[in-house]
Amino acid sequence: MSLSTLKNRRERGFFDGQFLIAMPGIEDRNFARTVIYICAHSDAGAMGFVINRPQSLTFTDVLLHLDMIKQEDQIVLPQRARDFPIQTGGPVESGRGFVLHSDDYSSDSSIPVSDDICLTATLDIVRAISKGDGPTRATMLLGYSSWGAGQLENEVVNNGWLTCPANEELIFDRSLDDKYERALAGMGVTAAMLSAEAGHA
């Protein structure tokens, strides 16, 4: 599923607003030990963002790359902008930035993905954040994760993923190191329990 499909969707799918939590059997380095927030799911496929993978780029790097600021301007950026988190959202269009954010910011290009969360993938939100005028809660993700028709359903049936309702606090939490464990804890399980279960499968 692509961003254009997300824009044009009419109905919410079964996995919309869910977390996917990778089972130990997933060895693909793009998805091992990941937590993915599913933004859209339909008969055409699914789209979401990994929310626990750091990115080496900083928000200042992004602004410099986009020629929004000059090297000497970075010292006058609001502290909130300098600290703004950048993460790796997935392997598809990995050079493109997407901002998941609270619904207190909206532009013509913002797409609601839940009652409280929107997705914006245009420069207007980057400018707003750089000036300290952006949404209260947000994170920028480079790239996204995508599944074709029936692919995600098949992976879930084959025990590739655990699923549970998404938690907004976890989506925007900047502490990434233990986010996988905390997502599992929200379901009452641990990584050790999953590994033991996989060993007996």
UniProtKB/Swiss-Prot annotation:
SUPFAM superfamilies xrefs: VC0467-like
The cross-references to InterPro entries, in alphabetical order and at most eight, read: AlgH-like
> Record's HAMAP family?
UPF0301
Regions annotated as coiled coil: none
Family statement drawn from the similarity comment of this UniProt entry: Belongs to the UPF0301 (AlgH) family.
Name the UniProt record assigns to this protein: UPF0301 protein Rleg2_0617
Write out the GO cellular component annotations.
cytosol
Gene3D superfamilies, per the entry: VC0467-like
Q: Name one Pfam family in it.
A: DUF179
- Signal peptide extent: none
